[in-house]
Swiss-Prot record:
InterPro entries: DNA-dir_DNA_pol_X, DNA_pol-X_BS, DNA_pol_b-like_N, DNA_pol_B_palm_palm, DNA_pol_lambd_fingers_domain, DNA_pol_lamdba_lyase_dom_sf, DNA_Pol_thumb_sf, DNA_pol_X. Its cofactor is Mg(2+). It comes from Rattus norvegicus. Its main location: nucleus. Its EC number is 2.7.7.7, 4.2.99.-, 4.2.99.18. K(+) 1 binds at K60, L62, V65. The keyword Protease does not apply. GO terms for biological process: apoptotic process; base-excision repair; base-excision repair, gap-filling; DNA damage response; DNA replication; double-strand break repair via nonhomologous end joining; homeostasis of number of cells; immunoglobulin heavy chain V-D-J recombination. The modification N6-acetyllysine is found at K72. This is DNA polymerase beta. Mg(2+) 1 binds at D190, D192. The gene is Polb.
């Protein structure tokens, strides 16, 4: 998944950008995931609010905006800034850790270790490539490209290449491009492809060739340019749309391809389509109805709370039907 969220271009873009910056600090520096989730949820809710927010009290009426976040909104609206963020930006260690985590492959712990060794900038990283693993070196190599959002038009062209090449190999393959793209987003951070085939189920033996054949085909047509990692069920790499001429090359983009057993495919499609908050709400509703859902299965809960056998699923609609929830099109899941 993409490391960066799109800058907000909504009525309340200043507020949502502030909350996203706070969220990233809590995740990357403080490693306080509960605060990260709280800021992200508030940012997501405010981004969809159809009016310009004039006070923290107004924001607090929205689900997911508590007293502390409302106070920060009041301060931001009154002064145009936030003291906490100013302090974070002025703290060399915090800002360096936050920056390094934007490099694909560098997580918060690795970033802190690098900063402790005095490595704080892209230039520092380039001088110390021997300290980086293969994944991180590729992240550094394409840093500027990976920072750019992928316009929907480009994603549609990328999708055409992937789906056409997959069907050429074997019409029985099923592939879906998930993430915010499937929810109709105007731009994406990366490309997340789910893949399945009738020959691969949760009961059968592993079928890594089903994934590797697709990767090799996409390399053959020069769509996949680099490999970050290639396992039995997941490929992580880099892709690039072919261009008409060398002068107007498309940026390199991150791509993940996951091979999922056919009987678990639609639970996977639902999960990887998101959004995170929509998934949490759906899981909570499922529990109320006596089911447990994850990225693999939906299972009924017995009276003791122990999950039973996975239920058969042949579409996303089946999952909604089991938990008696109105079906929501992917475009209506961006909570």
């Amino acid at each position: 998944m993409s490391k960066r969220k799109a800058p907000q271009e909504t009525l309340n873009g200043g507020i949502t950008d502030m909350l996203v910056e706070l969220a990233n600090f809590e995740k990357n520096v403080s490693q306080a995931i509960h605060k990260y989730n709280a800021y992200r949820k508030a940012a997501s809710v405010i981004a969809k609010y159809p009016h310009k927010i004039k006070s923290g009290a107004e924001a607090k009426k929205l689900p997911g905006v508590g007293t502390k976040i409302a106070e920060k909104i009041d301060e931001f609206l009154a002064t145009g800034k936030l003291r906490k963020l100013e302090k974070i930006r002025q703290d060399d260690t915090s800002s360096s850790i936050n920056f390094l985590t934007r490099v694909t492959g560098i997580g918060p712990s690795a970033a802190r270790k690098l900063v402790d060794e005095g490595i704080k900038t892209l230039e520092d990283l380039r001088k110390n490539e021997d300290k980086l693993n293969h994944h991180q070196r590729i992240g550094l190599k394409y840093f500027e490209d990976f920072e750019k959002r992928i316009p929907r038009e480009e994603m549609l062209q990328m999708q055409d290449i992937v789906l056409n090449e997959v069907k050429k190999l074997d019409p029985e393959y099923i592939a879906t491009v998930c993430g915010s793209f499937r929810r109709g987003a105007e731009s994406s951070g990366d490309m997340d492809v789910l893949l399945t085939h009738p020959n691969f189920t949760s009961e059968s033996s592993k079928q890594p060739k089903l994934l590797h054949r697709v990767v090799e085909q996409l390399q053959k047509v020069r769509f996949i340019t680099d490999t970050l990692s290639k396992g039995e069920t997941k490929f992580m790499g880099v892709c690039q749309l072919p261009s008409e001429n060398d002068e107007n090359e498309y940026p390199h983009r991150r791509i993940d391809i996951r091979l999922i057993p056919k009987d678990q495919y639609y639970c996977g499609v639902l999960y990887f389509t998101g959004s995170d908050i929509f998934n949490k709400n759906m899981r909570a509703h499922a529990l109320e109805k006596g089911f447990t859902i994850n990225e693999y299965t939906i299972r009924p809960l017995g009276v003791t709370g122990v999950a039973g056998e996975p239920l058969p699923v042949d579409s996303e609609q089946d999952i909604f039907d089991y938990i008696q929830w109105r079906y929501r099109e992917p475009k209506d899941r961006s909570e």
